[in-house]
């Protein structure tokens, strides 16, 4: 009977949440801060499900979380008819609920009312600081201009925001970063890219209210970098990423004048707009060095502490599979003083080649009322996960909202997954939180009680 009920509950969870589960790991608190996995959908934990998803594809290279929704951009998905006998390979944006992993209706991407079918046309997707989701395509070393679009997150329609010039240095561009307001209505905007197999970086700037973007290096569109870490590196190699630093304490928080660059053979290093290295992994414990071939980094703040998350290995990493480190930065936000908190997932997302995409996407959203950070982790062709980080996550000794096993503030199918993992012994939550029917034991009857709570709430 127990096995039957757990199987039935798992079937319900799978149906409702696109077969997402939790990673089954227990992460020890550090400095009173906890991390719990809300859900995970990947090759390692859901090996019969994730590989069948349409967003498990080497053309689905980047993803972003925005306002509680995950957007996964896949180029050239299907043939769309634009005229009799004429088709284009239309791009699609797949959407998931960030709280549960449940699939939402996908968006067929259009431009000027027609199917959008550019080669790697949605290669890079992200969001600005004002909730606008943007899309920028791959461009080759023969292409001089870069179109930048905003995405209507309800219809899939693209709107051309600007066309950026590469100037005299024309290199291949893969992945981009945007800080500020891409519409320039509420703030300035800065856009950056590091060219592929060159030492060139691009930067474009527009003041609030400005019509056009200009060169972001004192008027210049690009800059040649001469300092790398490790010092033996001479260019960014393949698929580098840039991440500009948001500084809420500054009078110009969206200036992005400090930024990380993470290249194929280099590790994340912090630069300024003169091209000088401000900080690097030189003084970091060698055990925390990321391996070559994986590119991805992000920052966040919590409990007046400054954190960084960075990719530590590709799919073929030594003992790793598409994982990341979360570290607290040292005094003055120094890399050399970093303290490791956790490796996520503790086991793996997957160990399957992504065809050379190399990018590893991270971004966060803040729940200021609960002092909780939601972290989204996406590795192309291997999987994705959502984590809650804070002092009040993970099911404390005293129960909070009845049924909120993972303490993310809502009661839904992700809590059923968490409870099942508790019963199976693959996750640790307080008994007081998991004893839904208050009979003094935690077992399959609590799963039934929790499902009834969810159904009643819906």
PLM region descriptions:
Residues 47-66, 113-126, 135-140, 166-195, ...:
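Signature of short aromatic-glycine-proline-rich micro-motifs recurring in repeat-based ectodomains
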Residues 88-101, 144-156, 199-208, 268-270, ...:
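Beta-propeller blade signature
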Residues 9, 13, 17, 392-458:
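Cellulosome-associated attachment modules in secreted, modular CAZymes
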Residues 24-48, 103-113, 157-168, 211-230, ...:
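Beta-propeller fold detector
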Residues 266, 280-344:
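Loop/turn-rich, solvent-exposed surfaces of beta-rich toroidal or solenoidal domains
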Residues 88-131:
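Blade-loop segments of beta-propeller domains
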Residues 69-72, 132-134, 186-192, 252-261, ...:
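Conserved beta-propeller blade signature
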Residues 76-85, 139-144, 194-198, 261-267, ...:
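Short glycine/acidic-enriched loop and turn motifs that connect beta-strands
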């Amino acid at each position: 009977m127990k096995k039957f009920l757990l199987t039935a509950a798992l079937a319900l969870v799978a149906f409702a949440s696109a077969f997402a589960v939790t990673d089954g790991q227990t992460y020890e608190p550090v400095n009173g801060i906890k991390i719990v996995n809300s859900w995970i959908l990947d090759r390692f934990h859901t090996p019969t499900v994730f590989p069948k998803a349409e967003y498990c594809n080497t053309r689905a290279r980047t993803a972003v979380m925005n306002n509680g929704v995950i957007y996964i951009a896949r180029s050239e998905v299907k043939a769309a008819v634009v005229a009799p006998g004429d088709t284009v390979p239309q791009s699609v944006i797949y959407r998931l609920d960030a709280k549960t992993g449940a699939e939402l209706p996908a968006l067929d991407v259009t431009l000027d009312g027609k199917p959008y079918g550019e080669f790697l046309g949605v290669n890079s997707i992200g969001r600005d600081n004002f909730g606008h989701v943007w899309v920028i395509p791959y461009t080759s070393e023969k292409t001089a201009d870069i179109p930048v679009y905003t995405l209507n997150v309800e219809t899939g329609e693209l709107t051309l925001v600007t066309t950026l010039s590469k100037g005299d240095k024309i290199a291949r561009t893969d992945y981009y970063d945007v800080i500020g307001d891409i519409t320039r209505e509420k703030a300035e905007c800065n856009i950056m890219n590091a060219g592929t197999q060159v030492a060139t970086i691009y930067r474009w700037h527009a003041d609030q209210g400005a019509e056009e973007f200009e060169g972001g290096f004192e008027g210049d569109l690009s800059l040649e970098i001469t300092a790398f870490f490790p010092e033996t590196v001479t260019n960014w190699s393949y698929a580098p990423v840039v991440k500009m630093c948001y500084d809420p304490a500054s009078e110009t928080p969206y200036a992005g004048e400090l930024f990380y660059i993470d290249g194929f053979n280099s590790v994340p290093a912090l630069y300024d707009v003169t091209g000088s290295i401000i900080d690097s992994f030189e003084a970091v414990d060698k055990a925390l060095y990321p391996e070559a071939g994986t590119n991805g980094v992000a920052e966040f703040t919590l409990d007046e502490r400054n954190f960084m998350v960075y990719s530590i290995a590709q799919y073929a990493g030594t003992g790793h599979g598409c994982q990341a480190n979360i570290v607290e930065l040292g005094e003055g936000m120094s890399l050399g003083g970093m303290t490791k908190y956790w490796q996520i997932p503790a086991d793996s997302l997957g160990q399957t080649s992504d065809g050379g995409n190399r990018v590893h996407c991270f971004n966060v959203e803040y729940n200021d009322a609960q002092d909780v950070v939601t972290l989204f982790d996406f590795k192309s062709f291997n999987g994705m996960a959502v984590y809650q980080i804070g002092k009040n996550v993970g099911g404390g000794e005293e129960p909070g909202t009845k049924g909120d096993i993972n303490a993310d503030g809502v009661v839904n199918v992700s809590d059923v997954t968490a409870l099942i993992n508790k019963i199976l012994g693959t996750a640790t939550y307080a008994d007081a939180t998991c004893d839904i029917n208050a009979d003094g034991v935690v077992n399959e009857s609590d799963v039934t009680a929790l499902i009834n709570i969810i159904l009643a709430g819906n």
